[in-house]
Every structure is written in structure tokens, then in C-alpha cells.
Amino acid sequence: MNSPSIHTIAPQNEQALLQRAQSLAGYNLAELADIALLPLPANLKRDKGWIGILLERFLGASAGSKPEQDFPEIGVELKTIPIDEQGKPLETTFVCVAPLTGNSGVTWESSHVRHKLARVLWIPVEGSRHIPLGERRIGTPLIWSPNDEEEEQLRCDWEELMDLIVLGRVESITARHGEVLQLRPKAANSRALTEAIGEFGQPILTLPRGFYLKKTFTAPLLARHFMQLSN
């Protein structure tokens, strides 16, 4: 098994990416931070994206914060997912920022959500709060695409949520909307407002929103993966 090393060049194919990710499995965050010369924060309250930034150094991600996938050369998105001792996800998974204006004629097929979730490298990371950040270990990665059933679930939720946005009802959307995909505010502070459409078609200011995968979607996805590993 390869030991972790920093990669500044993007992987040429999925197999190369998966090998890089597999080389991280079993290492804890402090060990990887030492190799990457990246300071380990006390916690993730102010550094929510820190684990992703750390892992990108070992994987050779090139997209940064652009709207395209993390590995645009091979069409793969990176998602880290905190898990408990049973391998179950501890929180929802951010997909992308939701467009609140200019949505006439937008379709699921051309949406950012579908583009981001077309091919995903999932990297589980221990996330239980009683484990100090530096001692949390990286799990075995998987590369995934939604099957027909998952794609249909995502499409139905996306269409329902986008209909509400277009109809000027963005502020009536709660985290309970959607079976597997939810829309909720994404802002570090409540002063970061963005333009949206109001109930009567008028421009309004509201908090930016993001699409998130619910745990009811990611839990069975991970369960299948861990089951395959144990067989």
C-alpha cells in the first residue's frame, strides 16, 4: 500500500485518484497535517472546510472553490463525510449553493446538483465529538454514482425545491422539505444576504441557501459500501 504523499498534479484517471485516497485510510488527521505542513485547528467550528483542504493536498484537487467538480479533468467531486463508530453519517452533506434567481427554463439534467453528484469520491472520517480532532482517522474511500432509484429521488426533491424558489416561496422552505435533498440557509453570519424572488415576483433579500444531502440518503449508501468491505 502506498504511503500518503502530497500531490500537486491532478490524477489522470479514477483509479489513480482512488489509489491516492486509499493511501490515506487508517491515518489520523494529525499525522496527515504533519506531512502536509498544515496547522491543526483546535476544532472545526471556524474551520469547517479544513478536512477537505487537507485531503485535497494529498489527492491533487485542482478546482478549489469553483462551481465545477473538484477533479474536473476526470469529472469527480470530493465529499468528506463524518461518521460514528457504526459507520453512520453524523451530519448532512453540502452539495452546492442554490441559485435563487435566473431559474427560468432550468432543468434537473443541466443543474449544478446533478453535475456535482454525477460521480463522487466519498471519504469517511471519524467524527464523534469525544475523539480529539487530531486523533480522528480516515476511512476507506469509495467512488460512487447515483443508481436509477437514487437519481429519481434526487430529481424529485430538486424539482420540488426549485419550483418553490421560482414561485417566490423560498422563505417558506424548511429542512423538512424533500425526502433526500434539503435546502437550508448557508451563511457564516445573518448579514450576508443575497437577492431572491418574493411571493409577488418582487426582488427580496434573503440568506443564501445551499442544497444538502440528508442522512437518510447517505446512510444506506455508506452501509452498502461497508458491507461490501466486510464480505
UniProtKB/Swiss-Prot annotation:
Entry's Gene Ontology cellular component terms: cytoplasm
Coiled-coil residue windows: none
InterPro entries cross-referenced by the UniProt entry: DNA_mismatch_repair_MutH, DNA_rep_MutH/RE_typeII_Sau3AI, DNA_rep_MutH/T2_RE_sf, Restrct_endonuc-II-like
Keyword DNA damage included in the entry's annotation: yes
Keywords: Cytoplasm, DNA damage, DNA repair, Endonuclease, Hydrolase, Nuclease
Keyword Hydrolase: yes
Any GO BP: mismatch repair
Places the protein is found: Cytoplasm
GO molecular function terms listed in the Swiss-Prot or TrEMBL record: DNA binding; endonuclease activity
SMART domains: MutH
Main localization (coarse): cytoplasm
Known function: Sequence-specific endonuclease that cleaves unmethylated GATC sequences. It is involved in DNA mismatch repair.
Sequence similarity: Belongs to the MutH family.
NCBIfam families: mutH_TIGR (TIGR02248), PRK05070.1 (NF003458)
HAMAP family: MutH (MF_00759)
Protein name: DNA mismatch repair protein MutH
Organism: Pectobacterium atrosepticum (strain SCRI 1043 / ATCC BAA-672)
Phylogenetic placement of the source organism: Bacteria, Pseudomonadati, Pseudomonadota, Gammaproteobacteria, Enterobacterales
